[in-house]
Amino acid sequence: MNEFDRVRDYLTDLQDRICAAVEAADGKARFAEDLWKREEGGGGRTRILRDGAVFEQAGIGFSDVSGTRLPPSASAHRPELAGATWRACGVSLVFHPHNPYIPTTHMNVRYFRAERDGEVVAAWFGGGFDLTPFYPFDEDVQHWHRVAQALCVPFGQERYAAHKRWCDEYFFLRHRNETRGVGGLFFDDLGQDFERDFAYQRAVGDGFLDAYIPIVQRRKDTPYGEREREFQLYRRGRYVEFNLVYDRGTLFGLQSGGRAESILMSLPPRVRWEYGFTPEPGSAEARLADYLIPRDWLG
């Protein structure tokens, strides 16, 4: 089996395993599957769970797509790939829970390969996971980062610190001067050693459930009211802003003629903006700002 097919098989299995775990955690709703094809090449399967007991919407998509010309979002920082054919596969998910005390989360793992005249000229892995709480708890954030740190250990002493820092820098809303959440791991252009890099991708993909599901179980029965719900919807607006303004994956998908429904499944089903909103000083809502700056959560 060639390298691309090995990655592809892992990713389809990962999607299946995460769906099964999320359905078990929700206990009510199940994923609906939408199979699709892309005219230029490839396709995928998008799965959406809606109106569950725990999750308002959970989307997880697998795609395997190809093309004859790289979109600007991909070739801008790799001009030597202009004119190359390409193929990319990945799994991407975003979960939006009902309860404002359960954080929203995102995970993505992907593999990209470019060829010219039948020769592979570039290949790399990318991905990571990050957490976006609305009412954060130190124990949840520390658990999230402990899992991230542990899965990085076999890949070198500096791996966690480097990819945590990359996550903090990538998921940053410059126009708001705040991070999207409390971070996690982020990496891209990882292509020095296929076996080692593929092992790291698997560690990230497999570690996601260990990082997230215990937080869901801990917070899913926390009582909340209209105030918390309104704040959750307001903060979801930041999520939308990041995905539509900064996210390279969203831009790549749209610029490459990708399937808009699948690309935009990351957006929350309900969201609101409020002009000039400022949380009451000393409130639980105001406390969130202390978490939206890069920090050493395990120090």
Curated annotation (Swiss-Prot):
Keywords: Cytoplasm, Heme biosynthesis, Metal-binding, Oxidoreductase, Porphyrin biosynthesis. GO terms for molecular function: coproporphyrinogen oxidase activity; metal ion binding; protein homodimerization activity. Transmembrane segments: none annotated. It catalyses: coproporphyrinogen III + O2 + 2 H(+) = protoporphyrinogen IX + 2 CO2 + 2 H2O. Belongs to the aerobic coproporphyrinogen-III oxidase family. Its cofactor is a divalent metal cation. This is Oxygen-dependent coproporphyrinogen-III oxidase. Homodimer. One of its GO terms (cellular component) is cytoplasm. It is found in: Cytoplasm. A divalent metal cation binds at residues 96, 106, 145, 175. The record marks 175 as: Important for dimerization. The active site is at residue 106. Its main location: cytoplasm. PANTHER family: COPROPORPHYRINOGEN III OXIDASE, MITOCHONDRIAL (PTHR10755), OXYGEN-DEPENDENT COPROPORPHYRINOGEN-III OXIDASE, MITOCHONDRIAL (PTHR10755:SF0). GO terms for biological process: protoporphyrinogen IX biosynthetic process. Involved in the heme biosynthesis. Catalyzes the aerobic oxidative decarboxylation of propionate groups of rings A and B of coproporphyrinogen-III to yield the vinyl groups in protoporphyrinogen-IX. Substrate binds at residues 92, 108-110, 257-259. InterPro entries: Coprogen_oxidase_aer, Coprogen_oxidase_aer_sf, Coprogen_oxidase_CS. The gene is hemF. PROSITE patterns: COPROGEN_OXIDASE (PS01021). Pathway: Porphyrin-containing compound metabolism; protoporphyrin-IX biosynthesis; protoporphyrinogen-IX from coproporphyrinogen-III (O2 route): step 1/1. Residues 239-274 are annotated as: Important for dimerization. Its EC number is 1.3.3.3.
